[in-house]
């Protein structure tokens, strides 16, 4: 069976601890498969292609098994800081199939399980762990820098585009015009109010060695004047992050810039990368699955230095069978009770605290002193 907590269904057992603040910490203990049911369906969506869901199931499994800690009250958190976990949804049949069919599969490098980082969208190019988190001194084994046309081609990948007409007339957004006029005035040493032409644009200076789609600087050669009189050419160079400062782009969750000339005569600067960009792009995997690629092809693309391996893990129990799940053996000093009716579990010790769930009748509750 399951218990409802904050509107979501959770399988397994709950360990509760009253914190010094008076609030209760709730820890859900479940078998690996049931944990993955609650991750895959929320890190992706049950509507994603089944092969993308299988790739997510393998990646999420390797990540949790590589990052569990035994030093605290729980093994891993349930937010996007680690992996999103939101319990069990019986209607997520694609998710359940993806988890069950790949349960014993992992990725390994030199005989050791790979910590499989992944994120929503890389913006068209992957990064290495050592580049994303230099202070952690992580190994790059299993990873590579590569262009990702699948992420880039997915219409659901987050992107903002800045357009500049080069050697032709064309529209410039008000925010970009304000930025160019301000920077041209500063460079020329007097106020200008008109852009008379843009002659070249480039986004350059890779933020990370070996990358081509994460640039830190932009150079623009243009002509500017005061009401068209005495037009002067000037080359502006500035950090790409300044597009945000001037309100040319708005999305603070995006982390990378790169650019290219298109066939219509516009230079386009792309503001991309929703997430760290290391390992699997979930939007890229979605596009690859839609194109008919298998989960193994998806994983090999994003973790090219890894090999498939297997682990010995128990088959998933039937979530509906009340006798299935994790066997729980209490320890320490406790009082055992069986609920005869629904019992409200509150966020703190006392009726003044809000109810977060109702423990069903017939549940075994252990209260520790």
Task: Annotate each predicted stretch with a short phrase.
Residues 1-369:
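Conserved, single-site charged/polar hotspot
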């Amino acid at each position: 069976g399951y218990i409802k907590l904050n509107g979501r269904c959770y399988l397994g057992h709950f360990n509760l601890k009253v914190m010094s603040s008076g609030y209760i910490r709730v820890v859900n203990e479940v078998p690996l498969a049931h944990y993955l049911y609650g991750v895959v369906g929320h890190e992706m969506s049950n509507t994603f292609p089944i092969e993308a869901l299988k790739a997510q199931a393998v990646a999420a499994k390797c990540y949790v098994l590589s990052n569990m800690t035994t030093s605290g009250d729980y093994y891993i958190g349930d937010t996007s800081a680690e992996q999103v976990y939101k319990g069990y949804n019986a209607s997520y049949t694609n998710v359940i199939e993806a988890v069950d069919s790949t349960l014993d599969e992992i990725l390994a490098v030199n005989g050791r399980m790979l910590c499989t980082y992944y994120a929503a969208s890389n913006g068209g190019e992957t990064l290495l762990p050592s580049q994303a988190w230099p202070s952690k001194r992580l190994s790059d084994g299993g990873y590579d820098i590569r262009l990702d046309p699948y992420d880039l081609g997915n219409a659901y990948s987050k992107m903002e585009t800045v357009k500049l007409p080069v050697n032709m007339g064309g529209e410039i957004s008000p925010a970009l015009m304000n930025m160019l006029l301000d920077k041209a005035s500063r460079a020329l040493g007097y106020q200008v109010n008109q852009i008379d032409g843009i002659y070249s644009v480039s986004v350059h200076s890779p933020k990370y060695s070996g990358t081509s789609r994460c640039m830190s600087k932009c150079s623009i050669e243009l002509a500017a004047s005061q009401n068209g009189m005495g037009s002067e050419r000037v080359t502006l160079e500035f950090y790409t992050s300044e597009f945000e400062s001037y309100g040319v782009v708005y999305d603070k969750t995006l982390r990378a810039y790169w650019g290219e000339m298109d066939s219509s005569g516009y230079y386009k600067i792309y503001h991309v990368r929703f997430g760290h960009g290391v390992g699997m792009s979930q939007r890229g995997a979605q596009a690859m699955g839609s194109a008919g690629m298998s989960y193994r092809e998806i994983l090999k693309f994003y973790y090219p230095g890894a090999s498939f391996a297997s682990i010995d893990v128990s088959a998933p129990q039937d979530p509906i069978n009340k006798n299935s799940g994790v066997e729980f053996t209490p320890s320490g000093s406790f009082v055992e009770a069986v609920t005869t009716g629904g019992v409200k579990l509150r966020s703190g010790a006392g009726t003044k605290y809000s109810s977060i769930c109702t423990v069903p009748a017939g549940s075994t509750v252990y209260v520790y002193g």
